[in-house]
From Swiss-Prot:
Positions of the GST N-terminal domain: 1-83
NADP is among the record's keywords: no
PANTHER family (alphabetical): GLUTATHIONE S TRANSFERASE D10, ISOFORM A-RELATED
Residue ranges of domain GST C-terminal in the record: 89-211
EC number from the UniProt entry: 2.5.1.18
Keyword Transferase: yes
Assigned keywords, A-Z: Transferase
InterPro entries assigned: Glutathione-S-Trfase_C-like (IPR010987), Glutathione-S-Trfase_C_sf (IPR036282), Glutathione_S-Trfase (IPR040079), Glutathione_S-Trfase_N (IPR004045), GST_C (IPR004046), Thioredoxin-like_sf (IPR036249)
Name of this protein: Glutathione S-transferase 1
Positions that bind glutathione: 11, 53-55, 67-69
Annotated gene: GST1
Signal peptide (from-to): none
């Protein structure tokens, strides 16, 4: 059966999964757009599959899984030719997992907290406390980047998930100052040169940027 990804291109977590699919060269994936602005994610059909009514949602045969980090690990474990994107070595995987939890626990909440009031609640400026959380995320990421990539010398799903969030934060909410965050700035530039980023992250990031710009005063 064909694998199906329910997604929204403007969504950073959905873009992360699309980058993983691209990196793994998984063929025959059906993409179904879910319009959050119109409430498509709240339909009975969708909430039966995902009670949390979030995107992305992956359907692989009769298996359903949501949350971009869980999907990323599943895809690499099942379809990866090797474990380079999600190492099986316990110590290496622990670092990757920590960075994934950093994205889900620090980066994405700061991103969502900034964008949700503007996109869905009619606010016309970012909340100052949310901007501070974005900067705190940058502070942590700068300290984590002691190697070429987010979790060491190998490009992993940690980079994919974190860059989906950080690129959006940089382009829309708080630009990354290369003098304050030289390592983070250099890492983001490296990520932006990758084919998976250009194909599956940049276009959706532009859509998100345009959407937010239309809402801000």
């Amino acid at each position: 059966m064909v694998m199906t990804l329910y997604k929204l291109d403007a969504s950073p977590p959905a873009r992360a999964v699309m980058m993983v699919i691209e990196a793994l060269k998984i063929p025959d994936v059906e993409y179904i757009d879910v319009n959050l602005l119109e409430g498509s994610h709240l339909s009975e059909e969708f909430t039966k599959m995902n009670p949390q009514h979030t995107v992305p949602l992956l359907k692989d045969d009769d298996f359903l899984v949501w949350d971009s980090h869980a999907i990323a690990g599943y895809l690499v474990s099942k379809y990866g030719a090797d474990d380079s994107l999600y190492p099986t070595d316990p110590k290496k995987r622990a670092i990757v997992d920590q960075r994934l939890h950093f994205d889900s626990g620090i980066l994405f909440p700061a991103l969502r907290g900034s964008l949700e009031p503007v996109i869905f609640w009619g606010e016309t400026a970012f909340r100052p406390e949310c901007l501070e959380k974005v900067r705190k995320g940058y502070d942590f990421a700068e300290k984590f980047l002691t190697s070429t990539w987010m979790a060491g010398e190998e490009f992993t799903v940690a980079d994919i998930c974190c860059v989906a969030s950080i690129s959006t934060m940089n382009d829309i909410i708080v630009p990354i100052d290369e003098n304050t965050y030289p390592k983070l700035s250099a890492w983001l530039e490296r990520c932006s040169q990758l084919d998976v980023y250009k194909k599956k992250n940049a276009p959706g990031n532009d859509l998100c940027k345009d959407l937010v710009a239309s809402k801000l005063s």
